[in-house]
Amino acid sequence: MTLTRREFIKHSGIAAGALVVTSAAPLPAWAEEKGGKILTAGRWGAMNVEVKDGKIVSSTGALAKTIPNSLQSTAADQVHTTARIQHPMVRKSYLDNPLQPAKGRGEDTYVQVSWEQALKLIHEQHDRIRKANGPSAIFAGSYGWRSSGVLHKAQTLLQRYMNLAGGYSGHSGDYSTGAAQVIMPHVVGSVEVYEQQTSWPLILENSQVVVLWGMNPLNTLKIAWSSTDEQGLEYFHQLKKSGKPVIAIDPIRSETIEFFDDNATWIAPNMGTDVALMLGIAHTLMTQGKHDKVFLEKYTTGYPQFEEYLTGKSDNTPKSAVWAAEITGVPEAQIVKLAELMAANRTMLMAGWGIQRQQYGEQKHWMLVTLAAMLGQIGTPGGGFGFSYHYSNGGNPTRVGGVLPEMSAAIAGHASEAADDGGMTAIPVARIVDALENPGGKYQHNGKEQTYPNIKMIWWAGGGNFTHHQDTNRLIKAWQKPEMIVVSECYWTAAAKHADIVLPITTSFERNDLTMTGDYSNQHIVPMKQAVAPQFEARNDFDVFADLAELLKPGGKEIYTEGKDEMAWLKFFYDAAQKGARAQRVTMPMFNAFWQQNKLIEMRHSEKNEQYVRYGDFRADPVKNALGTPSGKIEIYSKTLEKFGYKDCPAHPTWLAPDEWKGTADEKQLQLLTAHPAHRLHSQLNYAELRKKYAIADREPITIHTEDAARFGIANGDLVRVWNKRGQILTGAVVTDGIKKGVVCVHEGAWPDLENGLCKNGSANVLTADIPSSQLANACAGNSALVYIEKYTGNAPKLTAFDQPAVQA
């Protein structure tokens, strides 16, 4: 039976239907017969996985590399960890009375139920909530990194189901680049942070100075959104061998700075003062007459207004190197030298994203673009700026060949009527707690007044919001408000332990999929082959939502799957890539042959793409290749933002002091840096054996400057309590001179493990502030926080972050 979208809604709403729980696909014959090493992939690259007696025993990278990637050793941990969710579970109080549970989330025991019971309960309560409140009451934004693959995309599969059900509230933006991706379209006409960069071969050939501003590629290039092609680290290795001078601007002496060693000059400003430092450099360029007036006149708009601010004409405060030195802690002479070095050489300004994950984060990348414009090197080989060299191997030239399409949340012929009638909405992703606290509340976002939905149901699939969201204790309180929360997940994360219904999902090693390597290069197609059978009662998201679609109305499963099972979808995606490759005269084997060969496919080099210069066409002809801004030029002053009238995001790059920084700290407060960890992908793998490489006394480490440690009586290896008005955490001390005095670093991503108000595992977001970057982007500001530290002298509480929750027999 084939139903149109209108017939589907008309005949069913969300009426109950017969449920037949389909099992996960059987283990393919090739895995049983061949055993040994199986080719697959993850965010951290293509891997060979060794299987013995139905268990993964080891995993190694499948691509040659100079710099090892520790994350590629974790496949066995991912599948066989004791933190796995083994069975469908329902919170006892919720199971007893879904309409009025006796206990709050996070305080209850769980009850094991069958898959049929779990899906029936979800369906009934989803139906009730949707009918009573409409689609906007269902939040299925479900942000998170999930797993690699073009089919088994947890959030997409959830949203595909919710579209069939009649729509949902989603999210806009992300936690990684929330501020930059909203401001950059006003400045350069694109989100910029996810764009291909000037090619690495041109950097190595033409750049004379490379500035790494707030980025640590030796950590962040271990991963990619699809799967890393591993070329970014190879290019940084070549940059090191070239001997070119590298300027690293970062409050902490990162792994990347250590890697470059004598090639790198480390400059450590006070946290959050990057705009002031850039302004000091810009003022020096201007006063020395080293700014490129011709470039500014031809390719930008609004520089005269900005120069009035720079000189102090508009506010009586010249943004000189002396002024910048007082704010940043960087000596005046060094600021002047930086300006002179950048102006005298072909300079590439590479910037990371941590600098914009701060209050007023929009200003950081805007000011860096302005600085690059003053240097006049944008659009030249090896000059200008780039915001993705640290992410997914930006700058690795795009290959020629096939590109895999991906599963869509939309279903052919079945567009959501809710979207058509305005019944769907999206909130800025980092404002989820604001939305829960203020249903129906008004807020400003990117020039428009918007309204928070009244969220009654949340489904989180493949994401750890209790780890990536700021101010965990505030989140926990807001999390009590919805009527139902479902988490479908592989592991007992803190989010899962605060859900009403928890569904066990397969890891990528327990199912079949495909992925590209290189989000910019599209260098390889990799078969993500199932290595072992689904563990315990784990099922694929695809099968779970297909069964729920059948409960919407008989025939719903057929609509959801479009009549294709796992392998049929993979063949469909592969065939589309093969067709695209053929159009470019690149040969790919037929799907069945490709799948049996257990080999990846590498796409063809492109000499043209190896010569790619970001903004090269714009520089060559700014009229023909105008940018997507109102003026068609780089907007140093934005008339659009002037009309918005936001005091927290003025019309040109501006130094705005955050609420919590060195300038507002008392004598005992330190600034908190929440950097990306070396041996995790955010919160992923926190349970893995790699933990032994970094944990101190089985806690998340805290990096403390030697003088600060001495001041507070802390020695290397001590347990340290870190706290502020938002919460407290327990960490292990790493004492070093390799961090700015007055700054401490706790890497983001540790799983929250709260007991009597203390996070025993050291989750940084227990301490960070849940405030918006500004009214423009409403992005997260996790790097704007002050904390206190002290040596912990009590008995160390037992870590329980990775334990199973209490289950009623």
From Swiss-Prot:
Molecular function (GO) terms for this protein are: electron transfer activity; molybdenum ion binding; molybdopterin cofactor binding; trimethylamine-N-oxide reductase (cytochrome c) activity
Q: What is its EC number?
A: 1.7.2.3
Q: Which Gene3D superfamilies match?
A: 2.40.40.20, 3.40.50.740, Dimethylsulfoxide Reductase, domain 2, Dimethylsulfoxide Reductase, domain 3
- Post-translational modifications reported in the UniProt record: Exported by the Tat system. The position of the signal peptide cleavage has been experimentally proven. Can also be exported by the Sec system.
Q: Which InterPro entries match?
A: Asp_de-COase-like_dom_sf, BisC, CT_DMSOR/BSOR/TMAOR, Molybdopterin_N, MoPterin_dinucl-bd_dom, Mopterin_OxRdtase, Mopterin_OxRdtase_prok_CS, Prok_Mopterin_Oxidored
Its localization reads:
Periplasm
SUPFAM superfamilies per record: ADC-like, Formate dehydrogenase/DMSO reductase, domains 1-3
Q: Which UniProt keywords apply?
A: Metal-binding, Molybdenum, Oxidoreductase, Periplasm, Signal
Kindly give any further remark recorded in the entry. Expression of torYZ allows E.coli to grow anaerobically on a wider range of substrates than does expression of torCAD.
Put simply, this protein is called Trimethylamine-N-oxide reductase 2
